[in-house]
Amino acid sequence: MHHKSLAELASALKAREFSSEELTQHYLKRIERLNEDLNSFITVSTEEALKQAKAADAILQSGEGSSITGIPLAHKDIFCTTGVKTSCGSKMLDNFTAPYNATVVSRLKTAGAVMLGKTNMDEFAMGSSNETSFYGSVKNPWAHDRVPGGSSGGSAAAVAARLTPAATGTDTGGSIRQPAALCGITGLKPTYGRVSRYGMIAFASSLDQGGPMARTAQDAALLLNVMAGFDERDSTSVAQDVPDYTLSLEESIKGIKIGLPTEYFDENLNPGIAIPIEAAIKEFERLGAQIREISLPNTKLAVPTYYVVAPAECSSNLSRYDGTRFGYRCDNPKDLLELYCRSRGEGFGPEVKRRILIGTYVLSAGYYDAYYLKAQKLRRLISDDFKQALTEVDVIMGPTSPTPAFRLGEKSDDPVAMYLADIYTINVNLAGLPALSIPAGFAQGLPVGLQIIGNYFSESRLLNLAHRYQQVTDWHDRIPAGY
């Protein structure tokens, strides 16, 4: 069963080849057997999953249901879920259970999806390797001494290891696309505002965006159909009609203009990555696409800009965790100040503290203009680069990550090297554009991801390009040994 894609599983459920309960039990057994070593799940909701599966079977038996009714899924542990704890990978929320479901969770539940559990992640989504989690590092299924990427590393590893057909993720600077690339799956970051952020614990509110992580573009399209749409409870949600993303999957890509930024193919790119990426681009050329060279001149400013804007927003968002209302509270504080200091000092991990300190510094009275205001101006320039480029081409392509998955612990003591792992993804978030990563080959036996970036609300085109590529390649069907 676990070798089938989400779309294939949905067809099999409709044809009564097996029940949702049988399918759910199959995945729960795989999680029980394989997760202890992989560490991709923080919480497995066995009883609730089987209860939801039985309800889905009743709907399917009546001939009703959506395109994903009865399909087991996993949620990144950043989405609030009633009855199941939401930790955000942090000691601060180790015992927190939300009183409501995130919009993404409720929409998928209403559509009949079954929640297997909550996946591991970098603490408060801050990290590129899934090593900052309070619950320990996630291992890459392709090589257990390598990182799965972050911050949605648990979701990516679980999908790659076939512990779940698909999962939800969030992307603030590459946190869906980078782990998707490193684990050899498909991951889509929608346009900012396309998917509701209600109930998604905030890191950097102007950058955060939820999206699907799955084996194929078709699977991602099926999930996005349900996840996308306006939500009045999210002030940044966009009131724009949601198309059926599956309808455009089979369209011809002949004549589509693909731009290759010169800045994405410079000396920073690992040679092992360049070879499969160039081969993938040639495949698109064979499918009828036109390839053009373009420039995104402010690419090198993206990382420093992001690491002013994101920590500033993080500092503001995480100020709510003070030990007085919810979350971790220190024992026996002497006074209110000690309650604040010790609760935050003991509840947050080192990377989260680092970003809070950076954010507080750049927002301080003496440095606001020098750092934060300047970063917002640079953000506009980065966005303008994309705006200009996308008047010349339909989509932009390049590598998702400059290197394959690196070793666990390799960059833990070098935060700048870790931050540079997102050099090709961060600028997309700063501009609010949609982008996806698809498997495009291997380097040193490890997966390589191809990133496709589009204009605002062009998810249909991105999924169409990805699907057509996956029809003529089999990288997305490769499975790690032992899984």
Swiss-Prot record:
SUPFAM superfamilies: Amidase signature (AS) enzymes (SSF75304). Transmembrane segments: none annotated. It comes from the Bacteria. GO terms for molecular function: ATP binding; glutaminyl-tRNA synthase (glutamine-hydrolyzing) activity. Its EC number is 6.3.5.7. GO terms for biological process: translation. InterPro entries: Amidase, Amidase_CS, Amidase_dom, AS_sf, GatA. The active site is at K76, S151, S175. It catalyses: L-glutamyl-tRNA(Gln) + L-glutamine + ATP + H2O = L-glutaminyl-tRNA(Gln) + L-glutamate + ADP + phosphate + H(+). Keywords: ATP-binding, Ligase, Nucleotide-binding, Protein biosynthesis. Belongs to the amidase family. GatA subfamily. Allows the formation of correctly charged Gln-tRNA(Gln) through the transamidation of misacylated Glu-tRNA(Gln) in organisms which lack glutaminyl-tRNA synthetase. The reaction takes place in the presence of glutamine and ATP through an activated gamma-phospho-Glu-tRNA(Gln). Heterotrimer of A, B and C subunits. This is Glutamyl-tRNA(Gln) amidotransferase subunit A. The lineage of its organism: Bacteria, Pseudomonadati, Pseudomonadota, Gammaproteobacteria, Chromatiales.
